[in-house]
Protein backbone atom coordinates (compact mmCIF):
# COMPACT_ATOMS: atom_id res chain seq x y z
CA UNK A 1 0.00 0.00 0.00
CA UNK A 2 1.38 3.39 -0.99
CA UNK A 3 0.53 6.23 1.39
CA UNK A 4 1.18 9.86 0.40
CA UNK A 5 2.79 11.45 3.46
CA UNK A 6 4.93 14.20 4.90
CA UNK A 7 7.96 13.06 6.87
CA UNK A 8 8.89 14.89 10.06
CA UNK A 9 11.31 14.55 12.94
CA UNK A 10 11.16 15.74 16.52
CA UNK A 11 13.97 14.73 18.84
CA UNK A 12 15.06 11.34 17.59
CA UNK A 13 11.53 10.32 16.54
CA UNK A 14 10.71 10.20 12.84
CA UNK A 15 7.02 10.36 12.02
CA UNK A 16 4.83 10.49 8.93
CA UNK A 17 1.68 12.62 8.58
CA UNK A 18 -0.94 11.16 6.25
CA UNK A 19 -4.66 10.54 5.79
CA UNK A 20 -6.40 7.19 6.21
CA UNK A 21 -9.95 6.45 5.14
CA UNK A 22 -12.32 5.09 7.75
CA UNK A 23 -12.12 1.79 5.86
CA UNK A 24 -8.32 1.76 6.22
CA UNK A 25 -8.69 2.47 9.95
CA UNK A 26 -11.10 -0.46 10.17
CA UNK A 27 -8.89 -2.84 8.19
CA UNK A 28 -5.39 -1.88 9.32
CA UNK A 29 -5.52 -0.60 12.91
CA UNK A 30 -5.74 -3.20 15.66
CA UNK A 31 -6.39 -2.84 19.39
CA UNK A 32 -3.43 -2.44 21.70
CA UNK A 33 -2.29 -5.90 22.69
CA UNK A 34 -0.77 -7.09 25.96
CA UNK A 35 2.83 -6.53 24.98
CA UNK A 36 2.40 -2.77 25.41
CA UNK A 37 0.27 -2.60 28.56
CA UNK A 38 1.54 -5.44 30.69
CA UNK A 39 -0.43 -4.51 33.82
CA UNK A 40 -3.77 -6.39 33.99
CA UNK A 41 -5.57 -3.61 35.96
CA UNK A 42 -4.37 -1.03 33.41
CA UNK A 43 -5.62 -3.16 30.50
CA UNK A 44 -9.01 -3.52 32.23
CA UNK A 45 -9.31 0.25 32.80
CA UNK A 46 -8.39 0.94 29.18
CA UNK A 47 -10.98 -1.56 27.93
CA UNK A 48 -13.77 -0.15 30.14
CA UNK A 49 -12.91 3.36 29.03
CA UNK A 50 -12.86 2.26 25.37
CA UNK A 51 -16.34 0.78 25.63
CA UNK A 52 -17.86 3.92 27.19
CA UNK A 53 -16.13 6.57 25.10
CA UNK A 54 -16.09 4.79 21.75
CA UNK A 55 -19.88 4.53 21.89
CA UNK A 56 -20.17 8.31 22.28
CA UNK A 57 -17.76 8.83 19.41
CA UNK A 58 -19.71 6.39 17.22
CA UNK A 59 -22.90 8.40 17.85
CA UNK A 60 -21.08 11.67 17.15
CA UNK A 61 -19.93 10.31 13.78
CA UNK A 62 -23.38 8.97 12.90
CA UNK A 63 -25.31 12.05 14.06
CA UNK A 64 -23.16 14.99 12.93
CA UNK A 65 -22.38 16.06 9.39
CA UNK A 66 -19.95 18.70 10.70
CA UNK A 67 -17.85 16.08 12.54
CA UNK A 68 -14.12 16.58 12.93
CA UNK A 69 -11.32 14.88 14.88
CA UNK A 70 -7.71 15.66 15.53
CA UNK A 71 -5.05 13.27 14.19
CA UNK A 72 -4.66 9.71 15.41
CA UNK A 73 -1.16 8.72 16.50
CA UNK A 74 -0.52 5.20 15.22
CA UNK A 75 2.49 3.01 15.95
CA UNK A 76 3.79 0.74 13.20
CA UNK A 77 5.99 -2.30 13.69
CA UNK A 78 7.02 -5.43 11.80
CA UNK A 79 6.73 -5.56 8.02
CA UNK A 80 9.13 -3.48 5.96
CA UNK A 81 7.93 0.13 5.68
CA UNK A 82 9.85 2.04 3.02
CA UNK A 83 10.01 5.79 2.47
CA UNK A 84 10.45 7.29 -0.99
CA UNK A 85 10.96 11.03 -1.07
CA UNK A 86 9.44 12.96 -3.94
CA UNK A 87 11.53 16.04 -4.60
CA UNK A 88 9.95 18.99 -6.31
CA UNK A 89 10.42 22.72 -6.61
CA UNK A 90 7.88 25.49 -6.78
CA UNK A 91 8.88 29.09 -7.33
CA UNK A 92 12.53 28.37 -6.43
CA UNK A 93 11.55 26.61 -3.19
CA UNK A 94 12.33 22.95 -2.61
CA UNK A 95 10.07 20.73 -0.57
CA UNK A 96 11.94 17.81 0.94
CA UNK A 97 10.08 15.47 3.30
CA UNK A 98 7.16 14.92 0.92
CA UNK A 99 6.81 11.41 -0.41
CA UNK A 100 5.28 7.97 -0.33
CA UNK A 101 5.37 5.59 2.63
CA UNK A 102 5.06 2.03 1.38
CA UNK A 103 3.61 -0.65 3.66
CA UNK A 104 3.84 -4.25 2.44
CA UNK A 105 0.83 -5.44 4.46
CA UNK A 106 2.76 -7.35 7.12
CA UNK A 107 3.00 -4.34 9.40
CA UNK A 108 1.12 -4.23 12.67
CA UNK A 109 -0.52 -0.89 13.43
CA UNK A 110 -2.06 0.13 16.75
CA UNK A 111 -3.21 3.43 18.25
CA UNK A 112 -0.87 5.17 20.67
CA UNK A 113 -3.25 8.11 20.96
CA UNK A 114 -6.79 7.81 19.67
CA UNK A 115 -7.96 4.36 20.80
CA UNK A 116 -11.48 5.70 21.45
CA UNK A 117 -11.69 7.39 18.06
CA UNK A 118 -10.44 4.25 16.29
CA UNK A 119 -13.08 2.07 17.95
CA UNK A 120 -15.78 4.71 17.43
CA UNK A 121 -14.89 4.89 13.72
CA UNK A 122 -15.03 1.10 13.41
CA UNK A 123 -18.39 0.92 15.18
CA UNK A 124 -19.87 3.76 13.10
CA UNK A 125 -18.67 2.09 9.90
CA UNK A 126 -20.54 -1.09 10.90
CA UNK A 127 -23.75 0.97 11.07
CA UNK A 128 -23.14 3.08 7.96
CA UNK A 129 -20.89 1.77 5.17
CA UNK A 130 -21.21 5.10 3.36
CA UNK A 131 -18.62 6.42 5.85
CA UNK A 132 -15.90 4.17 4.37
CA UNK A 133 -14.28 6.92 2.27
CA UNK A 134 -14.25 9.61 4.96
CA UNK A 135 -10.69 10.51 5.93
CA UNK A 136 -8.89 11.26 9.17
CA UNK A 137 -5.37 12.56 9.69
CA UNK A 138 -2.89 10.08 11.11
CA UNK A 139 0.63 10.38 12.45
CA UNK A 140 2.57 7.15 11.94
CA UNK A 141 5.52 6.45 14.21
CA UNK A 142 7.84 3.49 14.42
CA UNK A 143 7.42 1.09 17.32
CA UNK A 144 9.98 -1.38 18.59
CA UNK A 145 9.06 -4.46 20.61
CA UNK A 146 12.25 -4.10 22.64
CA UNK A 147 11.88 -3.15 26.32
CA UNK A 148 12.93 0.42 25.54
CA UNK A 149 10.59 0.58 22.53
CA UNK A 150 7.60 -0.54 24.61
CA UNK A 151 8.41 2.05 27.29
CA UNK A 152 8.55 4.74 24.61
CA UNK A 153 5.16 3.71 23.17
CA UNK A 154 3.56 3.78 26.64
CA UNK A 155 4.72 7.40 27.16
How should each PLM-predicted stretch be described?
Residues 1-70, 74-102:
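N-terminal extension/subdomain marker
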Residues 46, 68-74, 78-79, 86-155:
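Basic- and aromatic-enriched surface patches that contact anionic nucleotides/nucleic acids
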